[in-house]
């Protein structure tokens, strides 16, 4: 992965037609230094929130590139090509803005800076529907204003584009705020998918085949992973996109939660508690990996197998 990204960055720097290579190299140095510092300081237990904040940067990049491409006076399209290009710009900024604001809220919830309790506003689904209608109407206005503007006029359609950006940011905030903190892993996976689609839309806008392919791969794999996670947790996939995910079920689980303090026990004690079973399946997950519990699990497995239990 590191080698591939290094080759991609090198090809981008050498392939870009610009006289400001010094700024590009400076940006690479600053970004690389920040990445190295984060990789060394962030613990595995904080990895989900790091992934969330990195997704926000992908969304922000899509928004900034979209505005820069739309306002570039050297970009000229006519007729159907102009309409298609404007739709690509619109979708890139739309998905990027939702990804950015949603990922920032997800980072805040995972890091404890924002309460993990779901924010269930009355009529939240009607609010989502209203935001969707506004996005469609403003998009139609944006395409018409841009098509009717003269060549070289970059300000035409800018106001609808800014309105849509604000609406998309609001939707991203509302979508993630309505989700309980315990369900954040599914949300992070979904935001990963959003970041991929934002990159793919940016690739169409810039006529960059590499961005289109990689963005589609990330977007589709993230969506499939989110669907599988929802099925495993007995959740509805569409509820993740609409918001309000994990409000009723999570609340009922919390009301019936067992009170008291957790007591640590040894691996031998765990094996003795499981000695009455005939077959045991141990499924490793993220928590086991973070806790580095593989050695303890191995000891439990040895004790159970010595008693004739199929593990």
Language-model features: where?
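C-terminal ends of transmembrane helices
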Residues: 33-51, 103-118, 171-184, 226-230
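Structural signature of hydrophobic alpha-helical transmembrane segments
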Residues: 15-32, 85-100, 154-167
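Transmembrane alpha-helix boundary signature
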Residues: 12-25, 37-47, 63-79, 143-150
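Mobile "lid/hinge" segments at catalytic clefts and subdomain interfaces of large enzymes
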Residues: 180, 194-238
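Membrane-interfacial segments at transmembrane helix termini in multi-pass membrane proteins
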Residues: 217-277
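Structured cytosolic domains appended to multi-pass membrane proteins
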Residues: 258-311
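Cytoplasmic-side transmembrane-helix entry/capping segments in multi-pass membrane proteins
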Residues: 1-6, 24-27, 46-58, 118-129, ...
């Amino acid at each position: 992965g590191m080698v591939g990204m290094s080759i991609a960055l090198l090809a981008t720097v050498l392939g870009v037609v610009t006289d400001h290579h010094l700024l590009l190299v400076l940006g690479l140095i600053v970004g690389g230094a920040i990445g190295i510092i984060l990789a060394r300081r962030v613990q595995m237990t904080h990895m989900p929130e790091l992934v969330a904040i990195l997704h926000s940067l992908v969304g922000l990049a899509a928004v900034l590139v979209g505005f820069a491409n739309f306002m570039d006076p050297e970009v000229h399209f006519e007729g159907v090509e102009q309409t298609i290009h404007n739709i690509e710009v619109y979708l890139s900024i739309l998905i990027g803005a939702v990804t950015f604001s949603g990922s920032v809220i997800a980072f805040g919830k995972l890091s404890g800076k924002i309460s993990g309790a779901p924010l269930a506003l009355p009529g939240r689904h009607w609010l989502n529907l209203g935001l969707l209608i506004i996005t469609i109407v403003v998009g139609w206005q944006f395409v018409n204003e841009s098509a009717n503007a003269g060549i070289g006029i970059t300000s035409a359609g800018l106001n609808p584009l800014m309105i849509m950006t604000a609406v998309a940011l609001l939707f991203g905030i509302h979508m993630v705020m309505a989700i309980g903190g315990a369900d954040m892993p599914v949300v992070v996976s979904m935001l990963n998918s959003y970041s991929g689609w934002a990159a793919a839309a940016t690739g169409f806008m810039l006529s960059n085949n590499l961005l289109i392919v990689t963005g589609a791969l990330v977007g589709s794999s993230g969506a499939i992973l989110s669907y599988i996670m929802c099925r495993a947790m007995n959740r509805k996939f569409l509820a993740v996109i609409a918001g309000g995910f994990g409000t009723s079920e999570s609340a009922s689980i919390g009301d019936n939660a067992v009170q008291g303090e957790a007591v640590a026990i040894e691996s031998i004690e765990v094996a003795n508690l499981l000695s009455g079973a005939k077959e045991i399946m141990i499924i490793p997950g993220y928590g086991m990996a973070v806790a580095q519990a593989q050695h303890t699990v191995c000891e439990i497995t040895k004790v159970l197998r010595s008693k004739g239990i199929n593990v």
